[in-house]
């Protein structure tokens, strides 16, 4: 379904004076960030001979630790812009955060299973607002189709909430659900 192009940037606040140093990499907990954090840790340990530690936390905690510059967390593995622009607008000018000069592009979108898409002829996000689709997405019997928009604290959840409104899905009976990714995954498997 329709995706939004978002630029993801890696914070490069790693300053090795020697390759044997320990780098603390924040892990904000979404699957893409966790994968990138693990890849960065592998590069630090396997290619640079250093040590790496993954430190879990939400964006506020990770950026706060980077800003304090006390070695609590030195790297944010997956900065999504414009979702996290408030953090970068604050920390980059202060010099406590440096963004990669070689950013990569990430795509953010919405998905349904192929089986669901085929059964209900879903080809665009607006199709989720059709009455038969809303009914099929209503797992708790309240008459509204649940739509996972992200976890509490994720800037993307706020963006997704606005997008659902702008697509007219609230008026069509779609209910935005904020929950941890693991909770969402468990619900999908039910």
Segments (PLM) and residue ranges:
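Bacterial N-terminal signal peptides
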Residues: 4-15
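Boundary at the C-terminal end of the N-terminal hydrophobic targeting segment
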Residues: 18-20
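Extracytoplasmic "Venus flytrap"
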Residues: 22-38, 59
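Short helix-initiation/N-cap motifs at beta->coil->alpha
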Residues: 30-31, 51-65, 171, 175-187
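Short, polar/charged alpha-helical segment
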Residues: 32-50
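Pocket-flanking alpha-helical
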Residues: 37, 55-94, 187-189
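Ligand-binding pocket segment of bilobal, Venus flytrap-like solute-binding proteins
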Residues: 73-77, 149-190
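A conserved helix-loop-strand patch within extracytoplasmic ligand-binding domains
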Residues: 96-149
């Amino acid at each position: 379904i329709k995706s939004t192009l978002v630029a993801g940037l890696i914070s490069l606040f790693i300053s090795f004076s020697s390759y044997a140093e320990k780098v603390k990499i924040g892990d904000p907990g979404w699957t893409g960030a966790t994968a990138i954090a693990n890849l960065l840790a592998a590069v630090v340990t396997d290619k640079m001979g250093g040590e790496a530690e993954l430190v879990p936390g939400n964006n506020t905690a990770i950026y706060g630790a980077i800003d304090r510059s006390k070695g609590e967390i030195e790297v944010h593995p997956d900065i999504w812009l414009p979702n996290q622009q408030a953090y970068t607008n604050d920390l980059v000018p202060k010099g406590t955060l440096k963004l990669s000069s070689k950013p990569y592009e990430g795509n953010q979108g919405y998905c349904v299973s192929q089986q669901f898409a085929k059964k209900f002829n879903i080809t665009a996000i607006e199709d989720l607002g059709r009455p038969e689709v809303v009914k099929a997405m209503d797992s708790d019997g309240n008459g509204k189709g649940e739509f996972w928009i992200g976890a509490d604290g994720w800037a993307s959840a706020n963006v997704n909430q606005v997008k659902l409104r702008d697509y007219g899905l609230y008026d069509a009976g779609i209910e935005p659900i904020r929950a941890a990714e693991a909770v969402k995954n468990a619900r999908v498997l039910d």
